[in-house]
């Protein structure tokens, strides 16, 4: 009995290999699901997010004044990034709202990338895009998409 080797049952080895592979597969699926969750939370506003009109100094929508376009809704203020196309003939103004959805403050007209700070207590935002070289100074419905595409607004949805 002194020189005998112990042999491991092939079924046992096969079971161990299968268990390890299943654990690796489950871990991979969890990692993908976690990363996908983050990607789904990052949103980009498209043309359909905007309407013709302005946001007045009180943070209210004015659809009678057609010199700009604005986001239709308030969006959660977690992380916001605003980028403009090079040579864009627009500016944008960012409006900050509190939990009561009342205007807290706004930025000056911006013409470059925004990754700024937010007022303390601000929970929501809206964007107004104002053309700087519109022929007649009035934004028409067919121009909305053109102006909206010049400014890319991305935000993280909780």
Q: Where do the language-model regions lie?
A:
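Extracellular ligand-binding interfaces
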Residues: 86-114
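Extra-cytoplasmic beta-strand recognition segments
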Residues: 70-92, 114-118
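Core beta-strand residues in small-molecule sensory/regulatory alpha/beta domains
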Residues: 55-56, 94-99, 130-132
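Noncatalytic modules at the cell exterior or secretory-pathway interfaces
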Residues: 78-83, 118-137
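N-terminal Sec-pathway targeting helices
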Residues: 7-22
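Glycan-recognition and processing domains
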Residues: 24-74, 133, 138-158
């Amino acid at each position: 009995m002194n020189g005998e080797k112990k042999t491991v049952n092939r079924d046992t080895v096969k079971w161990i290999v299968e268990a390890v592979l299943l654990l690796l597969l489950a871990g991979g699926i969890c990692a993908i699901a976690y990363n996908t969750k983050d990607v789904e939370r990052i949103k980009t506003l498209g043309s359909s997010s905007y309407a013709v009109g302005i946001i007045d100094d009180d943070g209210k929508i004015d659809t009678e004044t057609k010199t700009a376009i604005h986001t239709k809704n308030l969006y959660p203020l977690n992380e916001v990034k605003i980028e403009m196309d090079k040579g864009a003939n627009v500016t944008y103004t960012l409006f900050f709202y509190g939990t009561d959805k009342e205007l807290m403050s706004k930025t000056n007209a911006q013409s470059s990338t925004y990754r700024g700070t937010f007022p303390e207590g601000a929970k929501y935002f809206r964007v107004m895009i104002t053309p700087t070289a519109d022929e007649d100074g009035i934004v028409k419905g067919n121009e909305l998409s053109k102006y909206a595409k010049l400014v890319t607004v991305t935000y993280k949805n909780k």
